[in-house]
Amino acid sequence: MKIIIAGAGAVGTHLAKLLSDEKQDIILMDENEEKLSKLDSNFDLMTVNASPTSISGLKNAGVAGADLFIGVMPEESRNMTACMLATNMGAKKTVARIDNYEYLLPKHKEFFSQLGVHSLIYPEMLAAKDIVDAIKMSWIRQWWEFCGGALVLIGTKMRETAEILNVPLHELGGRNIPFHIVAIKRGNETIIPRGDDVIKLHDIVYFTTTKKYIPYIRKITGKENYPDVRNVMIMGGSRIAVRTTQYVPDYMQVKIIENDINRCNRLTEVVDDKVMIINGDGRDMDLLMEEGLKNTEAFVALTDNSETNILACLAAKRMGVTKTVAEVENIDYISMAESLDIGTVINKKMIAASHIYQMTVSYTHLRAHETR
């Protein structure tokens, strides 16, 4: 299958790396030749140094024969334009990264499809949903769904209470166990486990299973005593914070700490009345204690500064908060943040790339089935 990715930024680059392992015909387009040259020599893909909104550039990339065209440039308008051009020049299906939630409303779907934009990806919304999934099951660090939710991949950290510590994997129940351990992260090392490998204290273990057996995995990993989240404190009134408040269950009480008074005023207009908006510096521990940090089960740091978010989560952990979530947009910081035991790390660019990857794999399988 021929796939053209427009934009060699963080989303496009991560997506190209994922898809290059799938042995597809991948073409990455960007105007920045330096970005492309770094990728061209390291991954199984082709690059085209041209603007994705240029008709001549799209022709050079062979868009007429593309099965899938994906616009993931930073600018929403360019992604939409590139997808419209690609469809009219012969691309079978298009996906555009957007920043406007209004475009996702069902009443607009047919309109955009007629224009040539078949699917829309809104990273802030995807990140918000991941955050809510993380705090609803506070003992899980990462959660991904596949095959329409029929299969899940979860990551959780091993503490002293885990029943499966120091047991060779081949002794965990053989073929009858309702899960498969697909990876173990030990420090900065990722292990693809074999039967004689053992799970050690502080490992992050990744399981594939079905939702039916999540309680069983919770039991064997010693997480049954983790408290349910009732109180959530969010540091930073970003767009992701707004979307997060819209997806949290009704039984959760949410507070947003925001330093900018103008943004606080705006937040009062766009979030539900049940959400408390507090004007103050989220780095001020005295303020956080006054606002009930010790009675908070989940602390979510969503400022535009990765370092601030990491440090704030570390501080919240030390104050006894069970679940912390940090937005880390600097990709170079992600592995460091994970090693600091701050809980769940969110990067909206990587989430968007992973979501598009899952869409692409599903579309690839569908196309293969249609051609049989």
Residue ranges and their predicted role:
Residues 10-11, 15-136, 245, 251-363:
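Cytosolic ligand/metal-binding cores
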Residues 1-2, 8-22, 182-250, 256-262, ...:
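Hydrophobic, well-ordered beta-alpha structural blocks that scaffold small-molecule cofactor pockets
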Residues 2, 6, 29, 45-48, ...:
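Cytosolic Rossmann-like ligand/nucleotide-binding regulatory domains
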Residues 364-371:
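Conserved small/polar residues in nucleotide/adenosyl-binding loops
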Residues 74-75, 88, 115, 125, ...:
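Short flexible coil/turn linkers enriched for glycine and charged/polar residues
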Residues 100-101, 125, 149-150, 160-162, ...:
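Glycine-rich beta-alpha junction loops
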Residues 141-147, 194-198, 367:
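Short, flexible, solvent-exposed loop/turn segments with mixed acidic/basic and small polar residues
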Residues 130-151, 172-174:
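Rossmann-like NAD(P)H-binding beta-loop-alpha module
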